[in-house]
């Protein structure tokens, strides 16, 4: 998996960033609603690939446990994040501390959550093949990726000064279509609070770190100023930018 070193060694960057958005609650509610609507079964095997510290997974589990019997597996490359996850729960979860691409196969599952993971996958086609092979009959997988028109994607494109013709979302859909896999795409908007970059408080530094993929103290003042100006130009009157995501729902029917 590429570009993962920063978040594996400094997991607090993503943890702090996600608290500046409302995308977490939106994702939790969407997953819960989809499982309820599809009435998968009364006993659900759930797999979260790239579970991080469990801040999303635990809330999904807590909602579903009221209605279903759950068996949960969580895959995460960072042991530090797994330990954070464990501190949140008082029930059993099967943890796999490994790079998901190193696994020959994935656990058989009724629902698989893959949120902002595929951008770190080196061989997307092989990975998606593993996902499909692990889905039980009538199972569902959700892949969450940034939409091309998301403000945060535009910020990153401006910083990198390049635009890829084949985006991650497009590549996922291309592979699924090639394999004749049934899927739907839902465009979901959330907001990122970027007000902290005005006076560059701790929240502002978190935003800079997230977009630059480096620790704040390792970023030059000129780069910080460039990122700050790009974000401020895109922000609305409430000092927020739009996080637009593609929710790619995969169905094994």
Task: Locate each region found by the language model.
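A short acidic, Gly/Pro-enriched loop at the edge of an enzyme's catalytic core
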Residues: 104-112
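A short SAM/SAH-binding and catalytic strip from SAM-dependent methyltransferases
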Residues: 111-123
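Conserved class I S-adenosyl-L-methionine
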Residues: 1-38, 55, 59, 140-167
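Conserved Class I S-adenosyl-L-methionine
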Residues: 184-253
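A short glycine-rich, Lys/Arg-flanked "PGG" loop and its adjoining helix->strand segment in the class I
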Residues: 125-140
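Short alpha-helix
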Residues: 165-180
């Amino acid at each position: 998996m590429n570009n993962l070193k920063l978040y594996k060694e400094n997991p607090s960057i993503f943890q702090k960033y996600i608290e500046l958005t409302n995308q977490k609650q939106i994702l939790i509610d969407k997953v819960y609603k989809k499982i309820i609507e599809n009435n998968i079964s009364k006993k659900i095997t759930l797999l979260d690939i790239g579970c991080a510290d469990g801040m999303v997974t635990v809330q999904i589990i807590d909602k579903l446990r009221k209605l279903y019997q759950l068996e949960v597996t969580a895959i995460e490359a960072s042991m530090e994040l797994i330990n954070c996850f464990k501190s949140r729960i008082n029930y059993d979860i099967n943890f796999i501390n490994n790079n998901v691409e190193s696994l020959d196969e994935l656990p058989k599952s009724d629902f698989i959550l893959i949120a902002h993971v595929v951008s770190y996958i080196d061989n997307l086609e092989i990975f998606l093949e593993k996902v499909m092979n692990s889905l039980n009959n009538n199972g569902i997988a959700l892949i969450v990726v940034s939409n091309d028109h998301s403000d945060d994607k535009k910020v990153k494109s401006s910083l990198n000064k390049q635009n890829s013709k084949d985006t991650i979302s497009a590549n996922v859909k291309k592979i699924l279509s090639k394999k004749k896999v049934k899927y739907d795409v839902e465009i979901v908007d959330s907001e990122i609070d970027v007000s902290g970059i005005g006076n560059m408080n701790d929240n502002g530094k978190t935003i800079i770190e997230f977009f630059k993929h480096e620790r704040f103290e390792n970023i030059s003042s000129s780069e910080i100023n460039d990122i700050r100006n790009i974000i401020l130009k895109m922000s609305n009157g409430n000092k927020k930018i739009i996080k637009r995501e593609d929710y790619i729902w995969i169905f094994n029917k």
